[in-house]
Each structure stands twice: as C-alpha cells, then as structure tokens.
C-alpha cells in the first residue's frame, strides 16, 4: 500500500487505516458486534460505511466488555475510499454518537494488525474510596464506601505480578483461550485523596482478568487478605477463592503499544486540520456524507 501527498491511499488495492478511539462504555454492550445490542464496533462500522460506501470490518487491540471504557483503544479497517487521515477523523466524528470519539488516524501497511502487532495493552482501574459519593466521578470509578482501603498494601500485592506467569486464578469462565499465560510488565497503585488508580500493563489480558484482579485486591486493601495470601492464591491458580469481580465502570483501556507508533509520524495533528491544502479528491463532498448540522467546537458482584 502506498500513500499520496495528503496521506490518502493510492487507488488500487484497499488501504488499511488505523484509528485511536475513545468511548464511554456505560451505554454499550462491549466492543464486539452482538445482534440486537448497541456495541462500539457496530457504531464505528455504520459510521464508516456511510463515508466509504462499502462494507467494512473493524479489528480492535482489545475487545472490551460491557460497561468498560477506553481512552486509548486502537482499531483498524480496510477501505478503497481515498481520503486523508484528518478527513477521516473529521468525517467520522461528525457521524458518531457523543460517547465515541476518533482521536487520531494513520495509514499503515497491509501486514499491520491492531490486535496481533500490539506489544502490550494497559488498563487502569479507578476506585472512589469515600463515605460520600461524587456524582462526577462515579460513572468512571467503583464507589467503595465500605472501609478505607490500604493503597500501600494493594501496591505490595501488585508487586508480585510482573513476569511471565499463569494467571488462571483471574480468568473468567467461558474463555476460549487455550492457555492462561500472561506477561505482566508493570503493575502499580497510586492514591490521590479519595481516588485510587490501579494500572497494569501486559502483553495480553485473560477474559475478565482485570475485574477479578481488582476484586482480589480489594480484599487485600480492606485487610481481609494479607499480601502473602493474595500471592499464594494466584500463584497456585486457586480460582475458587477469587469469588468476586469488581464492577465494569471503573475499568478503562488507556493505551496500546506497538513496535512503531503509527500515529507518531503518520497520524493527524491539530496543525494539519483545516489547512486548505487537501487535494480535491481527499475532501468530503456533499455526496460523501448525509446532510448533518455541524457540531460546535467545543458493588462488587458475584461472578457467574
């Protein structure tokens, strides 16, 4: 695949476009298409097909579950539509619902894959540890009023995770993955006032892994489990003792790493937007999008 002066794909074989996207997961039934349900993949594909005028299929670095957010999800699709990356960004954002945003776009090689080329994913889990709720953080955190959580004990428990290990203790039933080996690169806990943030970076994540992990860490933070018990349970693969999953709204996919960041050199920047330098064929005309008004700037639960 080759690219013209404005970043649009040269006519011929389909081009592959990578996007960095954000979404608020509260009103989605996860990333992946589900018949009769509202999903992130469905919304992106429907908006893209209105521009491309042909069917598209999206692939994501991480297939987030119902209620889980993303601030740094990376996806890709193939298209014959010849548009500059910044034109794709503007066009998609004009069609997408308010709880999805495209933040960057870049053309990549035909061999690049949002999921399989990725080196790591990073998730953040936020806990609002207070006796009084805060409505402005509750939608993106786990409100935990039951007792003060010891963030230092949580950090000590997280320190047992880095390395290449079998994390079957944190795998939810129903996974089709043939093994439960994961390489954790970093795992840390920070606290600022009432807000606790737990971040884990790994080459991949098991089905339900982060929410089960947070449920176990809450046991440590509350003092019900020692750090030694936590480490012993997961190292022994004792799934029966990890009974609860933290709620989904505190979880967010914050980043995905690649050998070469496609958005660093080819992604759009604010300075490139609305420069008036696009070639005519790279602009969106009235026939490319349906008429639309321009937008102004602008508790733990049992696991089954």
Curated annotation (Swiss-Prot):
Keyword flag Calcium: no
**InterPro entries from the entry?**
PsdUridine_synth_cat_dom_sf, PsdUridine_synth_TruA, PsdUridine_synth_TruA_a/b_dom, PsdUridine_synth_TruA_C, TruA/RsuA/RluB/E/F_N
Name a Pfam family for this protein. PseudoU_synth_1
Q: Where is the active site?
A: 65
Q: Does the keyword Isomerase apply?
A: yes
Q: What class of enzyme is it?
A: isomerase
Its GO biological process annotations read: tRNA pseudouridine synthesis
Q: Residues annotated as region Disordered?
A: 274-304
Origin superkingdom: Bacteria
Write down the chemical reaction(s) this protein catalyses.
uridine(38/39/40) in tRNA = pseudouridine(38/39/40) in tRNA
Question: What residue spans carry the Basic and acidic residues bias annotation?
Answer: 289-298
Q: What Enzyme Commission number(s) appear in the record?
A: 5.4.99.12
Q: Which family does it belong to?
A: Belongs to the tRNA pseudouridine synthase TruA family.
Q: What does this protein do?
A: Formation of pseudouridine at positions 38, 39 and 40 in the anticodon stem and loop of transfer RNAs.
Quaternary structure? Homodimer.
Which PANTHER family does the record match to this protein?
PSEUDOURIDYLATE SYNTHASE (PTHR11142), TRNA PSEUDOURIDINE SYNTHASE-LIKE 1 (PTHR11142:SF0)
Q: What is this protein called?
A: tRNA pseudouridine synthase A
Tell me the organism: Gloeobacter violaceus (strain ATCC 29082 / PCC 7421)
